[in-house]
Amino acid sequence: MNVVSVVDILSGHVSKNTEITIQGWIRTRRDSKAKISFLDLYDGSCINSLQIIAYDKLHNYKNEILRLTSGCSVIIVGIIVKSIGIKQHVEVIAKNIKILGWIEDPSTYPITAKKHTMEYLREVSHLRPRTNTIGAVARIRDTLSQAIHNFLHKQGFIWIPTPIITACDTEGSSKMFCVSTSETQKILNNPNEKLHHTHDTTYDFFSKKAFLTVSGQLNAEAYACALSKVYTFGPTFRAEYSNTNRHLAEFWMIEPEAAFMTLDDIIILAESLLKNIIRILLEKRSDDIKYLVDKINKNIITILENFSEIKFNHIEYTEAIKLLEICNRKFNNPIHWGTDLFSEHEKYLSEEYFKSPVIIKNFPKNIKAFYMRLNDDNKTVASMDILVPGIGEIIGGSQREERLSKLDQRLQENCLTQENYWWYRDLRRYGTVPHSGFGLGFERLMIYVTGIKNIRDVIPFPRTSKNINF
């Protein structure tokens, strides 16, 4: 049985007049007066569907073929022939069609041929990958993931899996999910009973506080200080109640860490990474991107093509603040030296002032994490954010503080104890080395390359406050 995919056939990898077997789902069925049915078949291998010609001589034509509706799964044996239509150059004449799965009640099937809003599709996240848009997003996500792995491997980086359950707060924030088993059985027995918050972890699984990770960075640093170049690519969690199109409670991060690298080194690495993976995306997923041009954003191809060639602007945080203070714009969030940049500030700089990606360096230490290297002015840290038009911040990074005395000072300033970070301090006690790294928010990258406006539509099953239905 010569099983092939739709993309194999449409790309010309299978010769005409070849008998093949193809499996997939029905997108649409059209019947002609000549007792011929035209079936559009998709299997997820590409954005396009394949036309299947079903003649009435098929043994199950009347009883089954004429009952096929959108979503039915089938396995088809047929011959590839030249198409007489203009939509595609080949089609398949069916010799046998076996129905694997019916739609129980087509009138209640949530995914019909008509156009659905993205809001509606979120309510049926388990079925939305059957739509062209979400299918395209999934393939783009896969291609970007592979491109990131390949780029970093070629640069000599080693992939390291870091813990999802952790005892450390990487960012020094309170927006963490606690992991506890102390009341698990009670909740399982009575799901409607509220959890009684307690700080007593004596009888808990780990006998101490545990959290879902907000970053794999600290663990990656440990391996970078032995293997030189490492990266982590995995899920991270933030207990943020922000109900915006830019925030998720669960999202994916790419976090390279490299020994002997400075802030300037990782800026070069980050810019090169972004340009490389977008160039590969244009090469490998042109059909999916062209589809999104028609459905989502007509300018997305131009934006991506320009991205690979455009020069990133570099400015100091202090300079960025001056630009924001003197611009003729009234912001909702007042800005002055020492405050962090909000989304409106980031978008003004990248979309209106520079009209291109911009890298902001050397932020005040009071608005950045404890692990960032203190600059000689004792006011700022060796940090950087990369802003892109339409998104704002897409990458954040820094040179890490390799000096134990300075690290202890920063821990104290952030009301963090040396005891909780004992192993992280050990990295400075035993053969410390300058090292740097950054974090790339994968879903924000997905928003940029697809033109989709809501971050909940570029991840398979979005997790947000009061939303965990799947």
Swiss-Prot record:
<comment type="subunit">
    <text>Homodimer.</text>
</comment>
<dbReference type="GO" id="GO:0005737">
    <property type="term" value="C:cytoplasm"/>
</dbReference>
<keyword id="KW-0067">ATP-binding</keyword>
<dbReference type="GO" id="GO:0003676">
    <property type="term" value="F:nucleic acid binding"/>
</dbReference>
<dbReference type="Pfam" id="PF01336">
    <property type="entry name" value="tRNA_anti-codon"/>
</dbReference>
<protein>
    <recommendedName>
        <fullName>Asparagine--tRNA ligase</fullName>
        <ecNumber>6.1.1.22</ecNumber>
    </recommendedName>
</protein>
<keyword id="KW-0648">Protein biosynthesis</keyword>
<dbReference type="GO" id="GO:0005524">
    <property type="term" value="F:ATP binding"/>
</dbReference>
<keyword id="KW-0436">Ligase</keyword>
<dbReference type="InterPro" id="IPR004522">
    <property type="entry name" value="Asn-tRNA-ligase"/>
</dbReference>
<dbReference type="GO" id="GO:0006421">
    <property type="term" value="P:asparaginyl-tRNA aminoacylation"/>
</dbReference>
<dbReference type="Pfam" id="PF00152">
    <property type="entry name" value="tRNA-synt_2"/>
</dbReference>
<dbReference type="InterPro" id="IPR004364">
    <property type="entry name" value="Aa-tRNA-synt_II"/>
</dbReference>
<dbReference type="InterPro" id="IPR006195">
    <property type="entry name" value="aa-tRNA-synth_II"/>
</dbReference>
<dbReference type="InterPro" id="IPR004365">
    <property type="entry name" value="NA-bd_OB_tRNA"/>
</dbReference>
<comment type="similarity">
    <text>Belongs to the class-II aminoacyl-tRNA synthetase family.</text>
</comment>
<dbReference type="InterPro" id="IPR012340">
    <property type="entry name" value="NA-bd_OB-fold"/>
</dbReference>
<keyword id="KW-0547">Nucleotide-binding</keyword>
<dbReference type="GO" id="GO:0004816">
    <property type="term" value="F:asparagine-tRNA ligase activity"/>
</dbReference>
<keyword id="KW-0030">Aminoacyl-tRNA synthetase</keyword>
<dbReference type="InterPro" id="IPR045864">
    <property type="entry name" value="aa-tRNA-synth_II/BPL/LPL"/>
</dbReference>
<keyword id="KW-0963">Cytoplasm</keyword>
<dbReference type="InterPro" id="IPR002312">
    <property type="entry name" value="Asp/Asn-tRNA-synth_IIb"/>
</dbReference>
